[in-house]
Swiss-Prot record:
<dbReference type="InterPro" id="IPR000796">
    <property type="entry name" value="Asp_trans"/>
</dbReference>
<keyword id="KW-0809">Transit peptide</keyword>
<dbReference type="GO" id="GO:0030170">
    <property type="term" value="F:pyridoxal phosphate binding"/>
</dbReference>
<dbReference type="GO" id="GO:0004069">
    <property type="term" value="F:L-aspartate:2-oxoglutarate aminotransferase activity"/>
</dbReference>
<comment type="similarity">
    <text>Belongs to the class-I pyridoxal-phosphate-dependent aminotransferase family.</text>
</comment>
<protein>
    <recommendedName>
        <fullName>Aspartate aminotransferase, chloroplastic</fullName>
        <ecNumber>2.6.1.1</ecNumber>
    </recommendedName>
</protein>
<feature type="transit peptide" description="Chloroplast">
    <location>
        <begin position="1"/>
        <end position="44"/>
    </location>
</feature>
<dbReference type="Pfam" id="PF00155">
    <property type="entry name" value="Aminotran_1_2"/>
</dbReference>
<dbReference type="GO" id="GO:0009058">
    <property type="term" value="P:biosynthetic process"/>
</dbReference>
<dbReference type="InterPro" id="IPR004838">
    <property type="entry name" value="NHTrfase_class1_PyrdxlP-BS"/>
</dbReference>
<feature type="binding site">
    <location>
        <position position="234"/>
    </location>
    <ligand>
        <name>L-aspartate</name>
    </ligand>
</feature>
<dbReference type="InterPro" id="IPR015422">
    <property type="entry name" value="PyrdxlP-dep_Trfase_small"/>
</dbReference>
<dbReference type="InterPro" id="IPR015424">
    <property type="entry name" value="PyrdxlP-dep_Trfase"/>
</dbReference>
<keyword id="KW-0808">Transferase</keyword>
<comment type="subunit">
    <text>Homodimer.</text>
</comment>
<dbReference type="GO" id="GO:0006536">
    <property type="term" value="P:glutamate metabolic process"/>
</dbReference>
<feature type="binding site">
    <location>
        <position position="85"/>
    </location>
    <ligand>
        <name>L-aspartate</name>
    </ligand>
</feature>
């Protein structure tokens, strides 16, 4: 119980039950646990106990989502938010796909309820997402060899898989590209799954270090999980060629590793759902067992709906059934069951021939706008930079991100001087850039590259 000290104009105002001698606790200056409050002629000093949470330290801001908070606080009219990977229109406004609006209207017309989904999610969604990934007639689907359950977008789906690895592959290591998406390491750390890195980005060429990648995958302990970006590598935008994917599959098979794909941009990288799934389908055709996490944040713009899936391709239908049962067991205490709204949107869009065609057209439009902006940025850099630097790496990258090659100090200059908000590894999201601001961004990049070391 907190102690009190009352200072009154007349001691006769003290309550009878309070002993005046017991009130001599000192002042707030001499006792750090006392706080003084004044009420007219009465001063009350309260002893406050230390918080039980004193040992909890302040967490650092998220390196990606924290960029948006800093951007919002900036009042400069030329500011650009190129940090978070979210699609914007040419006017730099959020975009809700027309086909998503149609799917939502359909749900309203039908009067869909808000009842709980099963632990594994919406059956129509799970069927649709597996078919989008592998193709409707693929043997893994026909033979029921893929365990698919709905997850909380890409992050939640990765986390489910990480928990499965921790439980059933004790001591196994996940090997991650260097660099990779900022949340990958957090997810495996949280699941207590050890990880290491394989070489991926070559700063000298601002391209793929393919030889280093292959060498490191070969050196990984046999049976490691090799985390691969299915398309539009984040943060570099650098993807292996089809021939290089074949070599990657060869090495993973030779070493008895388990591939683990993160597919966050299917259809959003090239504009084609099938082309962006080619790497995953290559591994499936070889009869390999592997994981695939999916997200619909980018290709359907369902960022806030948290809609995705984890797929585990197995060698038999029996194994897939058992894997699915354990994924459900993991999900139950973690979040119980997934949200229905986004799952119904995906199921409606994929299940309707007209809406599916409209979705593909909108994806092509979004991917096309990013390609146009990428070309315009390159053209602006070439025309403005008289140093002779080769900027062609920008055109060789794919998807919504570009790895500029800028270091932390140069990235800081982009923000501090030019009000261009980006992650400190030099990644920019071209989805947040307009044609009108390409020249301004080119000026910022040229200044930061040449004048900041």
């Amino acid at each position: 119980m907190a102690s009190l000290m009352l200072s009154l104009g007349s001691t006769s105002l003290l309550p009878r039950e309070i002993n005046k001698d017991k009130l001599k606790l000192g002042t707030s200056a001499s006792n750090p646990f006392l706080k003084a409050k004044s009420f007219s002629r009465v001063t009350m000093t309260v002893a406050v106990k230390p918080s039980r949470f004193e040992g909890i330290t302040m967490a650092p801001p998220d390196p990606i989502l924290g960029v948006s908070e800093a951007f919002k606080a900036d009042t400069n009219g030329m500011k650009l938010n190129l940090g978070v990977g979210a699609y914007r229109t040419e006017e730099l406004q959020p975009y809700v796909l027309n086909v998503v609006k149609k799917a939502e209207n359909l749900m309203l017309e039908r009067g869909d309820n808000k009842e709980y989904l099963p632990i594994e999610g919406l059956a129509a969604f799970n069927k649709a997402t597996a078919e989008l990934l592998f193709g409707a007639g693929h043997p893994v689907i026909k033979e029921q060899r893929v365990a698919t359950i709905q997850g909380l977008s890409g992050t939640g789906s990765l986390r489910l898989a990480a928990a499965l690895i921790e439980r059933y592959f004790p001591g196994a290591k996940v090997v991650i590209s260097s660099p990779t998406w900022g949340n990958h390491k957090n997810i495996f750390n949280d699941a207590k799954v050890p990880w290491s890195e394989y070489r991926y980005y070559d700063p000298k060429t601002i391209g793929l270090d393919f030889e280093g990648m292959i060498a490191d995958i070969k050196e990984a302990p046999e049976g490691s999980f090799i985390l691969l970006h299915g398309c539009a590598h984040n943060p570099t935008g650098i993807d292996p060629t089809p021939e290089q994917w074949v070599k990657i599959a060869d090495v993973i098979q030779e070493k008895n590793h388990i591939p683990f794909f993160d597919v966050a941009y299917q259809g959003f990288a090239s504009g084609s759902l099938d082309e962006d799934a080619a790497s995953v389908r290559l591994f499936a055709e070889r009869g390999m067992e592997f994981f695939v996490a999916q997200s619909y944040s980018k290709n359907l713009g369902l960022y806030a709906e948290r809609i995705g899936a984890i797929n585990v391709v197995c060698s038999s239908a029996d194994a897939a059934t058992r894997v699915k049962s354990q994924l459900k067991r993991i999900a139950r205490p973690m979040y119980s069951n997934p949200p229905v709204h986004g799952a119904r949107i995906v199921a409606n869009v994929v299940g309707d021939v007209t809406m599916f065609s409209e979705w593909k057209a909108e994806m092509e439009m979004m991917a096309g706008r990013i390609k146009t902006v990428r070309q315009e940025l390159y053209d602006s850099l070439v025309s403005k930079d008289k140093s002779g630097k080769d900027w062609s790496f920008i055109l060789k990258q794919i998807g919504m991100f570009s790895f500029t090659g800028l270091n932390k100090a140069q990235s800081d200059n982009m923000t501090d001087k030019w009000h261009v908000y980006m992650t400190k590894d030099g990644r920019i999201s071209l989805a947040g850039l307009s044609l009108a601001k390409c020249e301004y961004l080119a000026d910022a990049i040229i200044d930061s590259y040449h004048n900041v070391s």
